[in-house]
């Protein structure tokens, strides 16, 4: 850019337009502060849809505007309150100077550790880490979702370990595992797996070891809440055994390493087959023992039933004999009763009026058909009826 100095008519003091003086300052800034490091605390963080990140760096006395252009890869994730050292250069925009950030590192771990402890306590009080809300892993998942970097040793180790233990379908959702976009990409991956019509049975979130800065994205509060809200069980495998992040507490299970995560998720096929064979042998032996016991029991029951059968047959024969005797006695008794009744009937027949009439007797009745048994009941001119064996006649007493 060419700068032309305009002379004032009043004196020799140079005169600039706003654009010119801004250009001079821009050039001065770029030439003087083309590569600097500025230490301060991030505040006023803003992420518009453009993908650029706007924030301010402040210390106890001053504030400077800063911007990180979309596409700049940083190891540290932006977070209000972080104390960082930003590498970049100064630039002038709209008559204001700002720091263009090209790299960023953590300034110290003391404040970070305090922030992490505070977040952990907050989520713990909410019950986010409670064992009661953790989901059990499926016994033998046939589909495993893996959220990790598509390159590097981690994904290779996981796939290799899956093949060794129990070959299963592995669906990889590639993400960045460090830097400013890491936590957002992991959140998107977890939500994406949960939205599948045929989702994986378990999810492994993994990355290899790294510095405190490298692992910082996995201390994100929104990520921890997303992990806890997942309907699919999640195993966290971040860093090495001594590395702990917030999602390790929010996950349903924590593995010390990515390969250890596979070992928690999948049983070893050879051991599983051996265990099944052992259980089969035990079951077979137990079944054979039960069969023999039942055979012995059936034989005993057969013997008992045979004895009972013979006893029942004997009792049946005795019962039949008693039945025949009872039938005979009943017949004899009935015959005697019949004879007795016949004799009674014969006796009664002698007292029947017809029988009496048949031997020459007569029955006398008055005009009211009342039987007369004494002459004293009769008077002269009384009309009577005389019944004989072969008929009746009327008569008058004279």
From Swiss-Prot:
<dbReference type="GO" id="GO:0005737">
    <property type="term" value="C:cytoplasm"/>
</dbReference>
<keyword id="KW-0540">Nuclease</keyword>
<dbReference type="InterPro" id="IPR025824">
    <property type="entry name" value="OB-fold_nuc-bd_dom"/>
</dbReference>
<comment type="similarity">
    <text>Belongs to the XseA family.</text>
</comment>
<dbReference type="Pfam" id="PF02601">
    <property type="entry name" value="Exonuc_VII_L"/>
</dbReference>
<dbReference type="GO" id="GO:0006308">
    <property type="term" value="P:DNA catabolic process"/>
</dbReference>
<dbReference type="Pfam" id="PF13742">
    <property type="entry name" value="tRNA_anti_2"/>
</dbReference>
<dbReference type="GO" id="GO:0009318">
    <property type="term" value="C:exodeoxyribonuclease VII complex"/>
</dbReference>
<keyword id="KW-0963">Cytoplasm</keyword>
<comment type="subunit">
    <text>Heterooligomer composed of large and small subunits.</text>
</comment>
<protein>
    <recommendedName>
        <fullName>Exodeoxyribonuclease 7 large subunit</fullName>
        <ecNumber>3.1.11.6</ecNumber>
    </recommendedName>
</protein>
<comment type="function">
    <text>Bidirectionally degrades single-stranded DNA into large acid-insoluble oligonucleotides, which are then degraded further into small acid-soluble oligonucleotides.</text>
</comment>
<dbReference type="InterPro" id="IPR020579">
    <property type="entry name" value="Exonuc_VII_lsu_C"/>
</dbReference>
<dbReference type="GO" id="GO:0003676">
    <property type="term" value="F:nucleic acid binding"/>
</dbReference>
<dbReference type="InterPro" id="IPR003753">
    <property type="entry name" value="Exonuc_VII_L"/>
</dbReference>
<dbReference type="GO" id="GO:0008855">
    <property type="term" value="F:exodeoxyribonuclease VII activity"/>
</dbReference>
<keyword id="KW-0269">Exonuclease</keyword>
<keyword id="KW-0378">Hydrolase</keyword>
